[in-house]
A protein has these predicted regions:
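Phosphate-binding glycine-rich loop
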Residues: 79-118
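Active-site pre-lysine segment of PLP-dependent enzymes
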Residues: 153-162, 178-198, 202-215
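Short N-terminal helix/helix-N-cap motif within the alpha/beta-hydrolase-1
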Residues: 100, 106, 124, 177, ...
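N-terminal secretory signal peptides and thylakoid transit peptides that target proteins
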Residues: 1-16
Protein backbone atom coordinates (compact mmCIF):
# COMPACT_ATOMS: atom_id res chain seq x y z
CA UNK A 1 0.00 0.00 0.00
CA UNK A 2 2.84 2.38 0.85
CA UNK A 3 4.44 1.78 -2.54
CA UNK A 4 1.17 2.61 -4.26
CA UNK A 5 0.84 5.86 -2.28
CA UNK A 6 4.40 6.86 -3.13
CA UNK A 7 3.74 6.15 -6.80
CA UNK A 8 0.55 8.26 -6.75
CA UNK A 9 2.43 11.13 -5.11
CA UNK A 10 5.10 11.05 -7.81
CA UNK A 11 2.53 10.94 -10.58
CA UNK A 12 0.56 13.82 -9.04
CA UNK A 13 3.68 15.95 -8.76
CA UNK A 14 4.55 15.18 -12.36
CA UNK A 15 1.13 16.27 -13.58
CA UNK A 16 1.27 19.50 -11.59
CA UNK A 17 4.67 20.21 -13.09
CA UNK A 18 3.24 20.04 -16.60
CA UNK A 19 1.19 23.19 -16.09
CA UNK A 20 -2.52 23.85 -16.33
CA UNK A 21 -2.49 24.33 -20.10
CA UNK A 22 -1.26 20.80 -20.73
CA UNK A 23 -3.69 19.20 -18.30
CA UNK A 24 -6.33 19.30 -21.04
CA UNK A 25 -4.53 16.44 -22.77
CA UNK A 26 -5.39 14.21 -19.82
CA UNK A 27 -9.14 14.66 -20.17
CA UNK A 28 -11.10 11.63 -21.35
CA UNK A 29 -11.81 11.72 -25.09
CA UNK A 30 -15.49 11.95 -25.92
CA UNK A 31 -15.14 8.90 -28.18
CA UNK A 32 -14.85 6.67 -25.10
CA UNK A 33 -18.58 7.14 -24.56
CA UNK A 34 -20.18 4.55 -26.81
CA UNK A 35 -23.74 5.51 -25.90
CA UNK A 36 -23.59 9.07 -27.24
CA UNK A 37 -26.31 10.15 -29.64
CA UNK A 38 -24.34 10.83 -32.83
CA UNK A 39 -27.05 13.16 -34.10
CA UNK A 40 -26.20 15.62 -31.33
CA UNK A 41 -22.54 14.79 -30.70
CA UNK A 42 -19.32 14.49 -32.76
CA UNK A 43 -18.88 11.66 -35.24
CA UNK A 44 -17.38 8.49 -33.72
CA UNK A 45 -14.56 8.00 -36.22
CA UNK A 46 -13.15 4.94 -34.48
CA UNK A 47 -16.15 2.74 -35.22
CA UNK A 48 -16.75 3.07 -38.99
CA UNK A 49 -20.33 4.13 -38.33
CA UNK A 50 -22.74 6.24 -40.35
CA UNK A 51 -23.37 9.30 -38.12
CA UNK A 52 -26.60 10.13 -39.96
CA UNK A 53 -28.31 6.81 -39.39
CA UNK A 54 -30.24 4.86 -42.07
CA UNK A 55 -31.51 6.83 -45.06
CA UNK A 56 -35.29 7.43 -45.36
CA UNK A 57 -35.51 4.79 -48.11
CA UNK A 58 -33.62 2.27 -45.96
CA UNK A 59 -35.95 2.92 -43.04
CA UNK A 60 -38.99 2.28 -45.21
CA UNK A 61 -37.45 -0.94 -46.53
CA UNK A 62 -36.66 -2.13 -42.99
CA UNK A 63 -40.17 -1.35 -41.79
CA UNK A 64 -41.68 -3.24 -44.71
CA UNK A 65 -39.48 -6.25 -43.94
CA UNK A 66 -40.57 -6.64 -40.31
CA UNK A 67 -43.43 -8.98 -41.23
CA UNK A 68 -41.06 -11.41 -42.96
CA UNK A 69 -38.16 -11.07 -40.49
CA UNK A 70 -38.96 -14.52 -39.10
CA UNK A 71 -37.82 -16.10 -42.37
CA UNK A 72 -34.37 -16.64 -43.85
CA UNK A 73 -33.66 -14.06 -46.51
CA UNK A 74 -32.25 -16.32 -49.22
CA UNK A 75 -34.01 -14.43 -52.00
CA UNK A 76 -32.99 -11.03 -50.64
CA UNK A 77 -29.39 -12.19 -50.24
CA UNK A 78 -29.29 -13.35 -53.85
CA UNK A 79 -30.65 -10.00 -55.03
CA UNK A 80 -28.06 -8.15 -52.92
CA UNK A 81 -25.21 -10.23 -54.33
CA UNK A 82 -26.47 -9.57 -57.85
CA UNK A 83 -26.54 -5.81 -57.26
CA UNK A 84 -23.05 -5.79 -55.69
CA UNK A 85 -21.67 -7.76 -58.64
CA UNK A 86 -23.32 -5.40 -61.11
CA UNK A 87 -21.94 -2.33 -59.38
CA UNK A 88 -18.39 -3.68 -59.26
CA UNK A 89 -18.52 -5.31 -62.71
CA UNK A 90 -17.61 -8.77 -61.44
CA UNK A 91 -19.18 -12.22 -61.54
CA UNK A 92 -21.70 -12.85 -58.76
CA UNK A 93 -19.79 -16.04 -57.93
CA UNK A 94 -16.98 -13.80 -56.68
CA UNK A 95 -19.20 -12.13 -54.07
CA UNK A 96 -19.47 -13.39 -50.49
CA UNK A 97 -21.79 -11.71 -48.00
CA UNK A 98 -21.32 -11.99 -44.25
CA UNK A 99 -22.27 -10.46 -40.92
CA UNK A 100 -19.83 -7.58 -41.25
CA UNK A 101 -16.37 -7.49 -42.79
CA UNK A 102 -14.72 -9.01 -39.70
CA UNK A 103 -16.37 -12.36 -40.43
CA UNK A 104 -14.87 -12.38 -43.92
CA UNK A 105 -11.46 -11.36 -42.58
CA UNK A 106 -11.67 -14.25 -40.12
CA UNK A 107 -12.48 -16.68 -42.93
CA UNK A 108 -9.46 -15.54 -44.95
CA UNK A 109 -7.25 -15.90 -41.88
CA UNK A 110 -8.49 -19.45 -41.34
CA UNK A 111 -7.81 -20.32 -44.97
CA UNK A 112 -4.32 -18.81 -44.87
CA UNK A 113 -3.50 -20.70 -41.66
CA UNK A 114 -4.30 -24.07 -43.21
CA UNK A 115 -0.60 -24.77 -43.84
CA UNK A 116 0.71 -22.62 -40.95
CA UNK A 117 3.49 -20.10 -41.66
CA UNK A 118 3.52 -16.29 -41.34
CA UNK A 119 1.54 -13.25 -42.38
CA UNK A 120 2.61 -9.64 -42.99
CA UNK A 121 0.76 -6.65 -41.60
CA UNK A 122 1.51 -2.95 -41.19
CA UNK A 123 1.84 -1.23 -37.83
CA UNK A 124 -0.37 0.51 -36.93
CA UNK A 125 -3.38 -0.76 -38.84
CA UNK A 126 -6.70 -2.50 -38.19
CA UNK A 127 -5.65 -5.81 -36.64
CA UNK A 128 -8.53 -6.82 -34.39
CA UNK A 129 -9.25 -9.86 -36.55
CA UNK A 130 -5.64 -11.12 -36.35
CA UNK A 131 -5.56 -11.90 -32.63
CA UNK A 132 -6.21 -15.67 -33.05
CA UNK A 133 -3.42 -15.93 -35.66
CA UNK A 134 -0.80 -17.48 -33.36
CA UNK A 135 -3.26 -20.07 -32.08
CA UNK A 136 -3.95 -20.96 -35.70
CA UNK A 137 -0.24 -21.39 -36.41
CA UNK A 138 0.51 -18.08 -38.15
CA UNK A 139 3.30 -15.84 -36.88
CA UNK A 140 2.94 -12.09 -37.32
CA UNK A 141 5.48 -10.00 -39.26
CA UNK A 142 4.86 -6.31 -38.50
CA UNK A 143 6.12 -3.66 -40.92
CA UNK A 144 6.09 -0.05 -39.62
CA UNK A 145 4.45 2.67 -41.69
CA UNK A 146 6.82 5.15 -43.32
CA UNK A 147 7.52 8.69 -42.09
CA UNK A 148 4.30 9.93 -43.75
CA UNK A 149 2.20 7.28 -41.97
CA UNK A 150 1.71 5.44 -45.26
CA UNK A 151 2.26 1.81 -46.17
CA UNK A 152 5.90 0.98 -46.91
CA UNK A 153 5.19 -1.42 -49.75
CA UNK A 154 8.88 -1.98 -50.52
CA UNK A 155 9.53 -2.98 -46.92
CA UNK A 156 6.56 -5.33 -47.03
CA UNK A 157 7.96 -7.01 -50.13
CA UNK A 158 11.32 -7.40 -48.41
CA UNK A 159 9.61 -8.90 -45.36
CA UNK A 160 8.22 -11.84 -47.34
CA UNK A 161 9.53 -15.22 -46.17
CA UNK A 162 9.33 -18.65 -47.71
CA UNK A 163 6.45 -19.52 -45.36
CA UNK A 164 4.45 -16.29 -45.82
CA UNK A 165 0.80 -17.10 -46.52
CA UNK A 166 -0.94 -13.73 -46.30
CA UNK A 167 -0.32 -9.99 -46.67
CA UNK A 168 -2.97 -7.66 -45.26
CA UNK A 169 -3.45 -4.09 -46.54
CA UNK A 170 -6.14 -1.78 -45.18
CA UNK A 171 -6.69 0.88 -47.83
CA UNK A 172 -7.37 3.60 -46.75
CA UNK A 173 -5.53 2.64 -43.62
CA UNK A 174 -7.25 2.53 -40.26
CA UNK A 175 -6.35 4.48 -38.09
CA UNK A 176 -4.07 6.85 -40.06
CA UNK A 177 -6.45 7.56 -42.97
CA UNK A 178 -3.61 7.43 -45.49
CA UNK A 179 -4.11 5.70 -48.83
CA UNK A 180 -2.02 3.69 -51.27
CA UNK A 181 -2.27 4.93 -54.83
CA UNK A 182 -4.05 2.49 -57.08
CA UNK A 183 -1.16 1.96 -59.53
CA UNK A 184 1.34 1.45 -56.69
CA UNK A 185 -0.92 -1.12 -55.08
CA UNK A 186 -1.52 -2.96 -58.34
CA UNK A 187 2.23 -3.11 -59.00
CA UNK A 188 2.80 -4.37 -55.46
CA UNK A 189 0.24 -7.15 -55.86
CA UNK A 190 1.81 -8.19 -59.16
CA UNK A 191 5.24 -8.44 -57.49
CA UNK A 192 4.03 -10.64 -54.65
CA UNK A 193 4.50 -14.38 -55.32
CA UNK A 194 1.29 -15.95 -56.61
CA UNK A 195 1.10 -18.45 -53.73
CA UNK A 196 0.60 -15.61 -51.22
CA UNK A 197 -2.83 -14.11 -50.55
CA UNK A 198 -2.90 -10.30 -50.73
CA UNK A 199 -5.96 -9.24 -48.74
CA UNK A 200 -6.96 -5.63 -49.49
CA UNK A 201 -9.51 -4.28 -47.01
CA UNK A 202 -11.36 -1.36 -48.65
CA UNK A 203 -13.82 -0.67 -45.83
CA UNK A 204 -13.27 3.09 -46.22
CA UNK A 205 -12.66 3.30 -49.99
CA UNK A 206 -16.00 5.02 -50.64
CA UNK A 207 -14.83 7.96 -48.54
CA UNK A 208 -12.04 8.65 -51.05
CA UNK A 209 -11.87 9.67 -54.70
CA UNK A 210 -9.90 6.54 -55.56
CA UNK A 211 -11.46 3.75 -57.58
CA UNK A 212 -11.82 0.41 -55.85
CA UNK A 213 -9.59 -2.46 -56.94
CA UNK A 214 -12.72 -4.51 -57.59
CA UNK A 215 -13.46 -2.73 -60.85
Amino acid sequence: MSNRRNWLKKVSLGIVGLGVGQLETFSNPITDNYDLNTVDFPILLRSNENPYGPSPLARVAMAESVNISNRYGWKTTSELISEIAKRNIVNSNNILTAAGSTEILDLVLLFAAHEKGSFIIANPTYDYWTYPSEKLGLSRISVPLDANKKYDLSAMLNAIKSDTRLIYICNPNNPTGTICKRDELVNFINEVPKNIIVLVDEAYIDFTRQQSLTN
